[in-house]
Amino acid sequence: MAKSHTLNPEEEFEEESGLRPSLLSEFIGQKEVLNNLTVYVQAAKNRKRALDHVLISGPPGLGKTTLAGIVSNELGTRLTITSAPVITKGADLARLLTSMGENEILFIDEIHTLHKKLEEILYPAMENYMIDLVIGEGVTAQMVQIPLKPFTLVGATTRSGLISEPLKSRFGIQLRLDYYNDEEMKEIVLRSSRILGVKIEDDAALEIGKRSRKTPRIANHLLKRIRDFSEVEGNLSVKKGLCLKAFEKMGIDDLGLDGMDRQILGCMIDRYKGGPVGLKAIAVVVGEEEKTIEDTYESFMVRIGLINRTPAGRVATEKAYRQLKRMQDFSENHGQDPTLF
């Protein structure tokens, strides 16, 4: 009988964390980013000083949080993780900053959502390791400067264009993560399978990688679901044929598109003749938040050429029609002879 891998939420979190690389040498892909970051980290270690503040941008799931953890491990310092949406008051941010030890790292995810008044607290903290606090109210109020220990702020964002220029300019190191290629995705799947104790053939790992939207987080999720199918069938190793059957059952196509992706494209084609159409209209039809569509679904489909963003709105490309096997609709929407396709 195959060994069960049913996990409770805590075990699931631990397993997920165990798949993250912990050192720069273990990180696959993002060569230029890694090469530069290796230099910056080594220089900080040599000087025995805090690393310059780091801004990491890129689509979700590419390794921004993982890189913050790696930097912490490489420098041998404590890492404090938080997210901008949960920092609602100046006192919250001040408490975080004053708790930082020398050369420690504060990681703030979704930093583009930080309120402008909170940004202003960060400016002197990042530049001079000081925060200005107002004590008291009215005529008795007075400004007090509180010194901080040297620390490194690592900010992560999926939307770097929304970060104000004054905040962005205070990050001495700015890194951009890009989508991974198929070979890198395959290596990530093989590494994760070794950690999980899953025997997998190379072509199966490549197939999982190709359908993971060029995103390691998705690859790890899909690997675990493929493991489920493999174990239930009593297989000793994961083969490509099993992957293809499992992906068909899960509704994931050869580009990694799932049901929601197809809903979005179908909405554009059926209701708006392929576009242009606004994001708000799409969100209402498919019943999903605009931000989720933009960050999770649309960015990938734009990248692989299924959607074009135009000043008038989103447009489904010819490739999108082909992927959905709807070239007849393309011909009708664009007034072209279907026999040409």
From Swiss-Prot:
Enzyme Commission designation: 3.6.4.-
Gene Ontology CC terms: cytoplasm; Holliday junction resolvase complex
Domain remark text: Has 3 domains, the large (RuvB-L) and small ATPase (RuvB-S) domains and the C-terminal head (RuvB-H) domain. The head domain binds DNA, while the ATPase domains jointly bind ATP, ADP or are empty depending on the state of the subunit in the translocation cycle. During a single DNA translocation step the structure of each domain remains the same, but their relative positions change.
Location in the cell: Cytoplasm
Keyword set includes Hydrolase: yes
Region (Head domain (RuvB-H)): 254-341
Region (Small ATPAse domain (RuvB-S)): 181-251
UniProt protein name: Holliday junction branch migration complex subunit RuvB
Binding of ATP, residues: L19, R20, G61, K64, T65, T66, R170, Y180, R217
GO biological process: DNA recombination; DNA repair
Residue ranges, annotated region (Large ATPase domain (RuvB-L)): 1-180
Predominant cellular place of this UniProt entry's protein: cytoplasm
UniProt function note: The RuvA-RuvB-RuvC complex processes Holliday junction (HJ) DNA during genetic recombination and DNA repair, while the RuvA-RuvB complex plays an important role in the rescue of blocked DNA replication forks via replication fork reversal (RFR). RuvA specifically binds to HJ cruciform DNA, conferring on it an open structure. The RuvB hexamer acts as an ATP-dependent pump, pulling dsDNA into and through the RuvAB complex. RuvB forms 2 homohexamers on either side of HJ DNA bound by 1 or 2 RuvA tetramers; 4 subunits per hexamer contact DNA at a time.
InterPro entries registered for this protein in UniProt: AAA+_ATPase, AAA_lid_4, DNA_helicase_Holl-junc_RuvB, P-loop_NTPase, RuvB-like_N, RuvB_C, WH-like_DNA-bd_sf, WH_DNA-bd_sf
Catalytic activity: ATP + H2O = ADP + phosphate + H(+)
UniProt cross-references to NCBIfam families, sorted A to Z: PRK00080.1, ruvB
SMART domains: AAA (SM00382)
Source organism of this protein record: Leptospira borgpetersenii serovar Hardjo-bovis (strain L550)
Subunit structure: Homohexamer. Forms an RuvA(8)-RuvB(12)-Holliday junction (HJ) complex. HJ DNA is sandwiched between 2 RuvA tetramers; dsDNA enters through RuvA and exits via RuvB. An RuvB hexamer assembles on each DNA strand where it exits the tetramer. Each RuvB hexamer is contacted by two RuvA subunits (via domain III) on 2 adjacent RuvB subunits; this complex drives branch migration. In the full resolvosome a probable DNA-RuvA(4)-RuvB(12)-RuvC(2) complex forms which resolves the HJ.
Residues noted as binding Mg(2+) in the record, renumbered to the chain: T65
Molecular function terms, GO-annotated: ATP binding; ATP hydrolysis activity; four-way junction DNA binding; four-way junction helicase activity
